[in-house]
Amino acid sequence: MASVKEGDYQALKEEIKKIMKQPGYDDGSAGPVLVRLAWHASGNFSLVEHNGGSNGAGMRFPPESVDPANAGLHYAISFLLPLQSANSWISHADLWTLAGVTAIEAMGGPQIPWEPGRLDYESEQAAVEHRGDVSNRLPDGALGAAHIRDVFGRMGFSDQEIVALSGAHNLGRCHADRSGFDGPWVVNPTRFSNQYFKLLLPGTRLMMLPTDMALIEDPSFRPWVEKYAADQNLFFKDFANAFGKLIELGVDRDDTGFARLAKKAAEEGKPLDKTAPPAGDETCPVSGAVGGGVQRAAGGGGCPFMAMQNREAKL
């Protein structure tokens, strides 16, 4: 696996696209499972507990690594491991989320907003100390609308965002040994489109979960299913916004753009000490912004790549 220049995320995305070609895996593509990895790494965030989310890459350690909801994601992690080993300057947490957005784009989907700066837990002990218990927070496909709202509401998503994010079921397939369900949702499970919503409405259905059917049975969800089935551009726009929000969950950035120990910072009610932001005459190789001028989705901040030169990207 190729090593790319430190901070060259575009080159890294090209390497991720090469990884997506997996003739021996589902439908010959790792794309859908890379999207699922980014989703599950982020989707255990809680606004109440102030923990979980994409920061830390906690799925490398128990109990997240053995959570039944994450069954099969070891394939995605193993596909990315050679690339991470060849480019140790990027954290697992950043690579997992970057791989997810890259896969969506490569499979014909929208461009998802993404920023670097996530850190990795160095050990299981560090993950447990800073992340806490994030089990039983991911959607259960066998349940209905109330469960969906509970899961997504915990992360701060609206009904519209819930339906948009559910459109990720246009990709990949279920496996009986992982979820108890089997088969793809759509005809072409490696191409991102609005076909999932079209198939949800009366017509031919390949395979739908109870959580999928809840989207057309619930009076608040269904109008969005109908809108996205009729307008792929609208779906792409709303999905990009919702997925970009999803992968930022738990990423409490400091003024250098790096993620803080979100739970500890919340408990103490103050930010943690960080290395000073880079000098104002330096240009960020990620965004092209100068010095601390780049603005981030989770708050203002400087360039995380340049700050990385002055600190170790580990929790």
Curated annotation (Swiss-Prot):
InterPro entries (UniProt xref): Ccp1-like, Haem_peroxidase, Haem_peroxidase_sf, Peroxidase_I, Peroxidases_AS
Site (Transition state stabilizer): residue numbering on this chain: 36
Ion transport in keyword set: no
Entry's cofactor comment: Binds 1 heme b (iron(II)-protoporphyrin IX) group per subunit.
Catalytic machinery residues: 40, 185
Transmembrane intervals: none
GO terms (BP aspect): cellular response to oxidative stress; hydrogen peroxide catabolic process; response to reactive oxygen species
Cited Gene3D superfamilies: 1.10.520.10, Peroxidase, domain 2
Major enzyme class: oxidoreductase
Pfam families the UniProt entry points to: peroxidase
UniProtKB keywords: Heme, Iron, Metal-binding, Oxidoreductase, Peroxidase
Binding site for heme b: 169
GO MF annotation terms: heme binding; metal ion binding; peroxidase activity
Region (Disordered): 267-286
Purpose of the protein: Destroys radicals which are normally produced within the cells and which are toxic to biological systems.
Family designation: Belongs to the peroxidase family. Cytochrome c peroxidase subfamily.
Name listed for the protein in its UniProt record: Putative heme-binding peroxidase
Organism: Cryptococcus neoformans var. neoformans serotype D (strain B-3501A) (Filobasidiella neoformans)
